[in-house]
Amino acid sequence: MTTNLLDQMNTLVPMVVEQSNKGERAYDIYSRLLKERIIFLVGPINDNVASLVTAQLLFLESEDPKKEINLYINSPGGLVTAGLGIYDTMQYIKPDVSTLCIGQAASMGSFLLAAGKKGKRFSLPNSRIMVHQPSAGFQGQATDIEIHANEVLALKKRLNEIYSKHTGKSVDDVKKALERDNFMTPDTAKEFGLIDEVVENRS
């Protein structure tokens, strides 16, 4: 995300004012929703975003290790290593993490969507979900390119195994599904095992 875009987002974030017996207190909307144990993962997944999401997960665990956390995802994907950092934290902490796709969950976005607690992975009906294999470009000496290519293959293998674990599909089925950009409707994603339910309204 460019600095200009971040600045625009910061200026557009609404503030919420709450009244209490101690007076008024203003929160930005995301901080207020964090009090309700809602974390937003919006935009490309990079190291900065991963750091923020991870910190919020750990904070909410420290607040109440038994209470569910809700992760709302609207992301085109991003860095595999950053996504794996969020994934590992989701699996590490004690609270269940419920995931909800709003808009899109592509690439590492879909990976994190599937990583929610089984039975608590959701999508809104008009969202778009996309899976594919990791990609990378290299420059340099042939030996270095070979090293990086082998690392990408190792990451691909690991991601396939994790998708298999969370979807219930065989690794071979996952490989086939991820061979190219594979766009899914929420209903198709449910059939594949990426999510558990398509939700239209709060029940």
Swiss-Prot record:
GO terms for biological process: protein quality control for misfolded or incompletely synthesized proteins. GO terms for cellular component: cytoplasm; endopeptidase Clp complex. Gene3D superfamilies: 2-enoyl-CoA Hydratase, Chain A, domain 1. GO terms for molecular function: ATP-dependent peptidase activity; ATPase binding; serine-type endopeptidase activity. Coiled coil: none annotated. Keywords: Cytoplasm, Hydrolase, Protease, Serine protease. InterPro entries: ClpP, ClpP/crotonase-like_dom_sf, ClpP/TepA, ClpP_His_AS, ClpP_Ser_AS. It holds the Pfam family CLP_protease. It catalyses: Hydrolysis of proteins to small peptides in the presence of ATP and magnesium. alpha-casein is the usual test substrate. In the absence of ATP, only oligopeptides shorter than five residues are hydrolyzed (such as succinyl-Leu-Tyr-|-NHMec, and Leu-Tyr-Leu-|-Tyr-Trp, in which cleavage of the -Tyr-|-Leu- and -Tyr-|-Trp bonds also occurs). It is found in: Cytoplasm. The active site is at 107 (nucleophile), 132. Its EC number is 3.4.21.92. NCBIfam families: clpP, PRK00277.1, PRK12553.1. Belongs to the peptidase S14 family. Cleaves peptides in various proteins in a process that requires ATP hydrolysis. Has a chymotrypsin-like activity. Plays a major role in the degradation of misfolded proteins. Fourteen ClpP subunits assemble into 2 heptameric rings which stack back to back to give a disk-like structure with a central cavity, resembling the structure of eukaryotic proteasomes. This is ATP-dependent Clp protease proteolytic subunit. The lineage of its organism: Bacteria, Pseudomonadati, Pseudomonadota, Alphaproteobacteria, Candidatus Pelagibacterales.
